[in-house]
UniProtKB/Swiss-Prot annotation:
The dsRNA-binding region is required for suppression of RNA silencing. Upon interferon induction, ISGylated via host HERC5; this results in the impairment of NS1 interaction with RNA targets due to its inability to form homodimers and to interact with host EIF2AK2/PKR. It is found in: Host nucleus; Host cytoplasm. Keywords: Eukaryotic host gene expression shutoff by virus, Host cytoplasm, Host gene expression shutoff by virus, Host mRNA suppression by virus, Host nucleus, Host-virus interaction, Inhibition of host innate immune response by virus, Inhibition of host interferon signaling pathway by virus, Inhibition of host PKR by virus, Inhibition of host pre-mRNA processing by virus, Inhibition of host RIG-I by virus, Inhibition of host RLR pathway by virus, Interferon antiviral system evasion, RNA-binding, Ubl conjugation, Viral immunoevasion. Belongs to the influenza A viruses NS1 family. It comes from the Viruses. Residues 1-73 are annotated as: RNA-binding and homodimerization. The lineage of its organism: Viruses, Riboviria, Orthornavirae, Negarnaviricota, Polyploviricotina. It holds the Pfam family Flu_NS1. This is Non-structural protein 1. A motif (Nuclear localization signal) lies at residues 34-38. HAMAP family: INFV_NS1. InterPro entries: NS1 (IPR004208), NS1A (IPR000256), NS1A_effect_dom-like_sf (IPR038064), uS15_NS1_RNA-bd_sf (IPR009068).
């Protein structure tokens, strides 16, 4: 196993522990707490994949961070902080919408890279809107936290989420996953719109009403892709 992979996991575990202590003091805002929950799932997945104990890794990560801080000058810290742009966290969904459980009558699922696409193919003839919470850096989508498809009644009928065991994705990965989700939903004669925030950063639509312009052949191809993977 690569030593950098292990040490990276150890540092991530310790930094998560620090953030958790911060949250326990009721100091974190909603985006902070949301990322904390997501990162916890990611660390569990990575720990399982690497065969490493999280508690042991946290202690090792603390030693690494302490060693770095001992060598770090205040001036170097200022320069490093200034050179890294702060991501903006954009939210279409409330915490309730993000954390709500949902069920599928006809579940379909596809894994595309490090993203998992899920939808209920029992849904037909509905008006659906895609909403997402994600971070942006340099005016580009950096990290997708969660994307969900909602009917006008507020029911959740689809979702795109990062796989905890496979962290890391690009804005193109997200665009492709959105295309697959839309294709599967429109196959059942649903009308799909994309939120203004998603249109701006993740899915640029040429239609004024926010409906993505997918040609029929592409929709059929995407729907078959979903159909073939459960």
């Amino acid at each position: 196993m690569d030593s950098n992979t292990v040490s990276s996991f150890q540092v991530d575990c310790f930094l998560w522990h620090v953030r958790k202590r911060f949250a326990d003091q009721e100091l974190g805002d909603a985006p902070f707490l949301d990322r904390l929950r997501r990162d916890q799932k990611s660390l569990r997945g990575r720990g399982s994949t690497l065969g490493l104990d999280i508690e042991t890794a946290t202690r090792a990560g603390k030693q690494i961070v302490e060693r770095i801080l001992e060598e770090e000058s205040d001036e170097a810290l200022k320069m490093t902080t200034a050179s890294v742009p702060a991501p903006r966290y954009l939210t279409d969904m409330t915490l309730e919408e993000m954390s709500r459980d949902w069920f599928m009558l006809m579940p379909k699922q596809k894994v595309a890279g490090s993203l998992c696409i899920r939808m209920d193919q029992a849904i037909m003839d509905k008006n659906i809107i895609l909403k997402a919470n994600f971070s942006v850096v340099f005016n580009r989508l950096e990290t997708l936290i969660l994307l969900r498809a909602f009917t006008e009644e507020g029911a959740i009928v689809g979702e795109i989420s990062p796989l905890p065991s496979l962290p890391g994705h690009t804005d193109e990965d997200v665009k492709n996953a959105i295309g697959v989700l839309i294709g599967g939903l429109e196959w059942n004669d649903n009308t799909v719109r994309v939120s203004e925030t998603l249109q701006k950063f993740a899915w640029r639509s040429s239609n004024e009403d926010g409906r993505p312009p997918l040609p029929p052949k592409q929709k059929r191809k995407m729907a078959r892709t979903i159909e073939s993977e459960v």
